[in-house]
Regions:
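Active-site groove signature of glycoside hydrolases
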Residues: 107-127, 146, 151-156
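A short, acidic, flexible beta-alpha connecting loop/helix-capping segment that sits on the rim
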Residues: 254-269
Length: 291
């Protein structure tokens, strides 16, 4: 059979406009309809939507209209982002559980592919792995009836910051649990050699972007303001893509460009340029035939 087509998902911050993670608001200044139309026109096959924008879009459109907007623009690989503090207790857990339920309800309504989650964001020291594993299993169990995958992102500013730790967290979970592997996080923790060790059953999603070899300020500052369009930085994008394909991955590819330069671009220009520069990275990639 022919190789699987390359289909791209615009992770939320890529087309959100002039907002940023942890800002005063995370809801996009661009209405969801505008983002969806710009994405569809450029060739994207899915969007990510964060919790704050989920709530704002529901208030503005209602869920039936949101579903129709996504369908009309051929956006089929959609994601809900990003759940934090699900391993905590008390008031923090209660807040996380409310967000979880709202993201899963919305994700079910739009047939979302993934619920993205962090693991120990901004926490230092070794993670309480038994607790993480138990809570993750519960997340997967709650998401499974909706057909939603729960995907963990290891990050260099989280307690779960490597491929090995992330695999330890998810490896005994349900079938809908696994990893979202972002090349920026891979690079900043020098995890390139670990990518091929990820079992295909646990490789649920991949995100592409680029960056300079040198970190600008702190890791968090660099991640939030200085990611680059694919091919305009120093990350090992093509070899990373090849390693992911060699594992056997055939799913859609997320693109997460969190960048001052991109967030201040006109929406249609951002949709087009990010799409084109990302697709250009696949030009000389060797793909196995789809099973």
């Amino acid at each position: 059979m022919a190789a699987a087509p390359i289909e791209l998902v615009a992770s939320y911050w890529t087309l959100a406009g002039n907002v940023m993670p942890g800002g005063p608001t995370e809801a996009s200044p661009h209405p969801l309809r505008d983002r969806a139309e710009a994405a569809g026109k450029a060739g994207w096959k899915g969007l990510g939507i964060v919790h704050g924008d989920v709530l704002a879009s529901i208030r503005h459109y209602g869920i039936p209209t949101i579903r129709r907007i996504l369908e009309d623009n051929a956006l089929v690989h959609n994601e809900v982002e990003v759940l934090t503090k699900w391993h905590r207790d008390g008031a923090k857990l209660a807040t996380s559980n409310q967000m979880r339920d709202e993201l899963l309800d919305f994700g079910a309504a739009i047939c979302a592919r993934n619920l993205k989650v962090t693991a120990g964001l901004f926490e230092e020291g070794p993670p309480d792995m038994p607790k993480f594993r138990d809570r993750f299993a519960d997340l997967c169990e709650r998401a499974a009836p909706y057909g939603i995958q729960v995907v963990v992102e290891f990050m260099p500013f989280s307690s779960v910051d490597t491929v090995d730790l992330a695999l330890e967290l998810v490896e005994n979970g349900l079938a809908n649990g696994g990893l979202m592997v972002d090349i920026w996080h891979v690079d900043r923790r020098d995890q390139y050699d670990k990518v091929k060790t990820i079992p295909l059953s646990l490789l649920k999603g991949v995100e592409l972007n680029d960056a300079s070899a040198n970190v600008a300020g702190t890791l968090l500052h660099d991640s939030t303001h200085h990611r680059k369009l694919c091919g305009e930085g120093d990350l090992k994008i093509r070899s990373f893509i090849q390693d992911v394909l060699d594992v056997g991955y055939t799913g859609p590819w997320g693109v997460e460009i969190i960048s001052h330069a991109v967030r201040t671009m006109p929406l249609e220009e951002a949709a087009r340029r990010v799409y084109e520069t990302t697709m250009s990275q696949f030009g000389e990639i060797r793909q196995a035939d789809a099973a």
